[in-house]
A protein has these predicted regions:
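Conserved phosphate-binding elements of NTP-dependent enzyme cores
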Residues: 1-837
Length: 837
């Protein structure tokens, strides 16, 4: 009898994430396959749809589907993405996104805790240290008893004790300094801030805390304490001043008369002196808003007991190789790596295997951080003081350490703030993720990062409504050969200088800005000479002192000199005759809420409201300009109060933010759609329709409105023509925010001005960098001195003058390595930046 043999066909595993009909933001119903298990780059000009594809489709669907598999109880505690506007996404893995702007950590976070390097250090100091006997203070040799949970015997007094555990050495737990609670910082009342204007009387509000933090009737109580309240504060006797600042909390009988003057009430009231008023308010603070009210009366300094180390005296006693935990945490990562490598050899032979395991765990984490160029950071550096790029690299290194597989990682511009010397380290981290069986999608503009991709997708061809299409896809070689690609010339390194080079003889023709400084942070004492009326790039590896030199020294010094005030303590002298303004144009978001839009920030909306108020329809309806305000006007949408969105409180689920169903995001009520103004081609437009247009579209639609046209043209010239007028400013990228802030400065004479930009190329495509260079040219042509802190090689190549800091980061930096034209820097053997020019 014949046997029937069943043959099971093995199903092929998916090879790609299949996206069909994606319409998120400006995506044009696109279909694209993203290879699985590869490093995939997404390129395109700013606003072309890169992030919409990577974050709005791939990450949104990958994370949402994973979360939907969890219980309702768990989901309600997590932020959930809504369904992406896409027909179908197949084979998308669970997704994690590393965003462009990681959140700023709290006051208890340090570089060591963020990277978990502190965990290894604490374990090392618990298991391998010379511990101190709590009975007689003698030191005990390292012993395996600690790891075994056994007691130690003091060789001096013979008594037994248990060594501290790793938890006992944590400043967020048992090892916290009792005085500062493990923050390393003490807040004390600044008495000088309590009475800022001593020419006022107490009745006139001389004692500020009594007016802002306490009942106003404290003035009357002070009078009952024997203080004259009707004479200028600077005429009070020392005894009276002491009562105001430090008087005892005694009850006084007063006759309280309300402000309306009707009736008087006898009261017994306890006197709160000015200092205690602030201390009492500080003790009751429950949130950041409350702290802001009190902060103006406080000064911060290192804790007097722990010296800013955050650790208790007991936690600072164990020693390894002659130093304690606080001293180890004060090292830079680079120094700590060298120190940790030498620890096992310093211990008894029987302890070396255990110490080696602990040290290896530290070194494996540290290796990636060093590769990413963070070796200059000290382990005790407060997490809140790290830059955006530094926080992003910490986040990236943490992800690699997890060694997960089958995950989709979406990285949003990980090269931000990264010196060219550290790009190889970044690529190595991404390759590690791919080698572990993950898919990495990286949105970036750095051609050195994009050139390493296994597969490249280019969005475009332009920004905004004209973008949202896939204009090239394939291997890097295939994209380089693509006729429609806009990134191809930059991948092929067809680079040329766009601005004429100023010769050495002409460089200082328009004058000098000179400054001499003492040491501050890691910057050594130095003298710097900056040419006026030029584009000057300040370069150097991360931590080399660029920010300290420019933002913490040059700008404050120029502002102080212009105002006739004292120079900062570390500035010896500054010579900048004729400089009246020093403007920092940074990448911080504009506005704190959705009510701030491109049109309101650029002073366009007010002019549009006046224009619509002049129309016959508005006059007939009785609408003045104020009625067209979406914040307070009669024509704002009553459902969303002019925000364009509403928040739904869904039981058992997180609040959901949706577009307002009444106005569909326009912010205006139905009545606003009945007021029209004639456009360029005779078409009739409403204000909500205009606010939904891009800057470039609005240029054609607002012919006849000279002020509006001038401001729109400025935005167009700044490369912001793709932004819609109603776009909320907090949602703009860092580069967009910088250029929008510049709008009010364009067109005026600038020969008394210095403009400082902190990494303005963040988020910019190489083509956008060319637009930015033309913006800088516009400022320089008006006489301005433009100083740019930058890593972008295209911008550095086009600078008139370069000041290169370094040679390394941290203690290995802080000096001017060389200064001159880009060609001079490229020829300088000591310059790390020069090697890449």
């Amino acid at each position: 009898m014949s046997r029937v043999i069943k043959v099971t066909e093995q199903k092929m595993s998916p090879q790609a994430i299949e996206v069909r009909g994606a319409r998120v933001h400006n995506l044009k119903d696109i279909d694209i396959d993203i290879p699985l298990g590869k490093l995939v780059g997404i390129a395109g000009v700013s606003g072309s749809g890169k992030s919409s594809l990577a974050l709005g489709v791939l990450y949104a669907e990958g994370s949402r589907r994973y979360l939907e598999a969890l219980s309702t109880y768990t989901r309600r505690r997590l932020t959930q993405a809504e369904h992406a506007q896409v027909d179908e996404v197949l084979h998308v893995p669970a997704a994690l996104a590393l965003h462009q702007r990681p959140s700023v950590p709290g006051v208890r976070s340090t570089f060591g805790t963020m990277t978990e390097l502190n965990n290894s250090l604490r374990l090392l100091f618990s298991r391998c240290a010379h511990h101190v006997c709590p009975h007689c203070g003698a030191r005990v040799e390292p012993s395996l008893n600690v790891a075994a949970g056994l007691s130690l015997t003091c060789p001096a007094c013979g008594r037994e004790f248990y060594a501290p555990s790793a938890e006992d050495l944590a400043f967020n737990s048992g090892g916290a300094c009792p005085t500062c609670g493990g923050t390393g910082v003490m807040r004390e009342v600044d008495e000088a801030s309590l009475v800022p204007d001593e020419s006022k009387t107490i009745n006139e509000g001389a004692v500020l805390p009594w007016g802002t933090l306490m009942w106003d009737l404290m003035k009357q109580v002070a009078g009952e304490m024997g203080v004259r309240t009707d004479v200028p504060f600077n005429q009070l006797t020392p005894e009276e001043r002491d009562i105001v600042f430090h008087g005892p909390a005694v009850k006084k009988h007063i006759l309280y008369v309300p402000k309306n003057g009707e009736g008087a009430t006898p009261l017994d009231f306890t006197y709160y002196n000015a200092v205690y008023t602030v201390e009492n308010a500080l003790a009751k603070v429950k949130d950041d808003k409350g702290l802001k009210r009190v902060a103006r009366f406080l000064r911060e300094g290192a804790c007097r007991d722990c010296g800013g180390t955050r650790l208790s005296e007991a936690a600072r006693q164990p020693q390894v190789c002659g130093i304690n935990l606080a001293q180890a945490a004060a090292m830079t990562l680079g120094d700590a790596v060298e120190w940790v490598r030498g620890v096992p050899a310093s211990l008894p032979p029987e302890m070396r295997p255990m110490a080696t395991d602990i040290c290896d765990s530290f070194l494996s984490v540290a290796r990636r951080l060093v590769d990413l160029g963070l070796d200059y950071l000290s382990l005790d550096r407060a997490g809140a003081t790290l830059s955006t790029g530094e926080r992003q690299r910490v986040q990236l290194a943490r992800v690699v350490r997890n060694r997960s597989t089958g995950v989709l990682y979406v990285l949003d511009e990980p090269s931000i703030g990264l010196h060219p010397a550290n790009v190889d380290g970044l690529v190595g981290v991404m390759r590690d993720l791919v080698d572990d069986g993950n898919t990495v999608v990286v949105v970036d503009h750095d051609t050195r990062v994009l050139a390493e991709a296994d597969y490249l997708v280019e969005m475009g061809p332009v920004a905004g409504a004209g973008g949202g299409s896939v204009i090239a896809a394939g291997t890097v070689d295939e994209v380089e050969q693509s006729q429609g690609s806009r990134i191809a010339p930059f991948l092929r390194a067809e680079l040329k200088r766009l601005r004429p080079q100023v010769t050495d003889d002409e460089m200082f023709d328009q004058g000098h800005i000179r400054m001499a400084t003492d040491a501050i942070h890691t910057v050594k004492p130095l003298e710097v000479d900056i040419p006026r009326g030029r584009l000057v790039a300040v370069t150097g590896v991360s931590g080399s002192g660029k920010t300290t030199l420019v933002l913490e020294t040059l700008i404050p010094a120029l502002k102080a000199q212009a105002a006739g005030e004292r120079l900062p303590g570390h500035v010896r002298w500054v010579d900048a005759e004729g400089i009246g303004r020093a403007n920092l144009i940074d990448a911080t978001p504009i506005g704190a809420n959705v009510r701030s839009t491109v049109a309101t920030y650029a002073d366009i909306h007010d002019e549009l409201r006046r224009a619509f108020a002049r129309t016959p329809e508005a006059k007939a309806a009785g609408y003045k300009a104020g009625a067209f305000s979406y914040n307070t006007g009669a024509l704002r949408c009553p459902t969303c109060d002019g925000t364009g969105s509403i928040s739904l409180d869904v039981q058992f689920l997180p609040d959901v933010e949706i577009i307002c169903p009444a106005c569909r995001g326009s912010r205006y009520a139905e009545a606003a759609s009945h007021i029209h103004r004639e456009g360029k081609d005779g078409s009739l437009l409403t204000l909500p329709q205009l606010m939904d247009m891009s800057v470039d579209e609005a240029l054609d639609a607002t012919v006849g409105l000279k002020k509006v046209q001038a401001r729109l043209q400025t935005l167009h010239d700044l490369g912001l023509g793709y932004l819609t007028l109603g776009e909320p400013t907090p949602a703009l990228s860092g580069g967009e925010a910088q250029r929008l802030k510049l709008a009010s400065e364009m067109g005026r004479v600038q020969d008394d001005a210095v403009f400082v930009f902190d990494e303005p190329t963040i988020g910019l495509h190489p083509l956008d960098v060319q637009v930015l260079l033309s913006v800088f040219d516009g400022l320089v042509s008006k006489g301005a001195t433009v100083i740019v802190i930058e890593h972008n090689l295209d911008l550095i190549r086009n600078a008139d003058y370069v000041i290169d800091m370094g040679p390394g980061g941290g203690d290995a930096g802080g000096q001017i390595v060389c200064a001159g034209t880009p060609a001079d820097i490229a020829a300088c053997p000591k310059s790390v930046t020069g090697r890449y020019l």
